[in-house]
Regions:
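Intrinsically disordered, low-complexity acidic Ser/Thr-rich regulatory segments
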Residues: 1-68, 117, 121, 125-131, ...
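Forkhead-associated
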Residues: 61-62, 74-131
């Protein structure tokens, strides 16, 4: 990756899009060292329960294309209004969002051994061209599907 098509942020997309009242469909593309592992796009459901990503999720809308250090139910992504959100599900190795707009990294949920006792980690909005790092070995590129 690293091409113009895959590194653009919300500023570029905003210049191409007309105002909308419906959130775009998003999908996840698994990557490895910045390159696509396979070209399979995992669509995210618009169902209010969302999509659960992990090694053994219990939901019908799930993504299991993850590395060995992803938890059974690692991350949930859902649509609320016109915005997509991600929230950690108490994973062992945590999740970090790398902003596609160049806004830096946001810790969605730190690894279990670094969490503050009793702290609730709120949902984080995700957008086209963001990257989600689940633990050390699983990265997804967020794309308009």
């Amino acid at each position: 990756f690293g091409t113009t098509e895959t590194t653009v942020g919300r500023g570029f997309m905003g210049s191409l899009e007309q105002p909308r009242t419906v959130a775009p469909n998003l999908g996840l593309l698994r990557t490895h060292a910045g390159n696509s592992v396979d070209m399979q796009i995992h669509p995210l459901t618009r169902d209010p329960r969302g999509t659960v990503i992990g090694s053994l999720p219990k939901t019908s809308s799930s993504i299991t294309d993850v590395g060995a250090d992803a938890s059974r139910e690692h991350l949930r992504i859902w649509l609320e209004g016109e915005h997509w959100y991600a929230q950690g599900l108490g994973s062992t190795n945590g999740t970090v969002l790398e902003s596609g707009a160049g806004d830096g990294d946001i810790v969605i949920e730190p690894p279990r051994d670094q969490r503050e006792p009793g702290k609730v980690y709120p949902p984080v909005e995700i957008e086209n061209s963001d990257r989600l790092h689940l633990g050390l070995y699983t990265t997804f590129l967020v794309i308009v599907d």
